[in-house]
Amino acid sequence: MALQYSVTVNNARLDAIETAIGTSAILKIRTGAVPANCGAADSGTVLATVNLPSDWMAAAASGAKAKSGTWQDTSADATGTAAHFRVYDSGGVTCHIQGTVGTSGTDMIVDNTSFAATQSFTINTFTITASNA
């Protein structure tokens, strides 16, 4: 049987993610397949780089932690199809979270996966859910 955690423990674990990454997190949306893990080299073309708000995730509740504030870029970096994202600390080098990008059924929901250089776009939904929430 897998370990089970209380809602209180799950919420604390989720809140620790934002604390560990810091208040100046950087989101990069990329083309191509998601790397094997956060320790693997970056892959794909960077379509957008977003400096996230200083309080970029809401407080965890009921075993889930959702994005906070507006996550938007007024000018995409390149043209291509968004397929995955990585969240880095303020240095923009160390990956701490990664996942898929799409308009539905993915880890991060965006308004459009077809990026054109200089286009504006918005991240609609991003929520981290604890494993047994």
Task: Label every PLM stretch briefly.
Residues 1-85, 89-133:
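Small cysteine-rich, disulfide-bonded extracellular modules of the LU/uPAR three-finger superfamily
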